Amino acid sequence: MDTETSPLLSHNLSTREGIKQSTQGLLAHTIARYPGTTAILLGILILLVIILIIVAIVYYNRSVDCKSSMPKPPPSYYVQQPEPHHHFPVFFRKRKNSTSLQSHIPSDEQLAELAHS
């Protein structure tokens, strides 16, 4: 049984080796004949692969960021809350403080009275 399959295997391997050698010979011949063009084409190919990797990383990061960020509720949601909780971001508390500070700002009429006195 080994004697029947071994010639087929050896023939198959020799065919593969022949194809491999002819391909390597063609590449070597092309590189030797056109070294500048081959270098330019290889450089362009490498740059395209690098750009493709960068674009894939950026696209993946954006899709992860979009999934992780929660949809923000409308601004009226925060107005209806009687007291801002501690887990809210700080700028919502500052907004409430700024509205309370605006009530202490004197109006134009009060400023005119102060200027005349």
Curated annotation (Swiss-Prot):
Induction (free text): Expressed in the late phase of the viral replicative cycle.
Membrane topology: Single-pass membrane protein
Keywords from the named record: Glycoprotein, Host endoplasmic reticulum, Host Golgi apparatus, Host membrane, Host-virus interaction, Inhibition of host innate immune response by virus, Late protein, Membrane, Transmembrane, Transmembrane helix, Viral immunoevasion, Virion
One GO cellular component term noted in the UniProt record for this chain: host cell Golgi membrane
Disulfide bonds: none
Glycosylation sites: N12, N61, N97
An example Gene Ontology biological process: symbiont-mediated suppression of host innate immune response
Claim: Transmembrane helix is one of the keywords in the record: yes
Membrane-traversing stretches: 39-59
Keyword Magnesium: no
Superkingdom to which the source organism belongs: Viruses
Protein localization: Virion membrane; Host endoplasmic reticulum membrane; Host Golgi apparatus membrane
Function recorded in the entry: Together with the penton and the other minor capsid proteins (M1249L, p49), forms a complicated network immediately below the outer capsid shell, stabilizing the whole capsid. Three copies of p17 encircle each p72 capsomer in the inner capsid shell, anchoring p72 capsomers on the inner membrane. Required for the assembly of the capsid and icosahedral morphogenesis. Additionally, inhibits the host cGAS-STING pathway through its interaction with STING1 and subsequent interference of the recruitment of downstream components TBK1 and IKBKE.
Similarity-based family: Belongs to the asfivirus minor capsid protein p17 family.
Subunit structure: Interacts with the minor capsid protein M1249L and with the hexon capsid protein p72 capsomers; these interactions form a rigid zipper structure that stabilizes the capsomers. Interacts with host STING1.
Name of the protein in its database record: Minor capsid protein p17
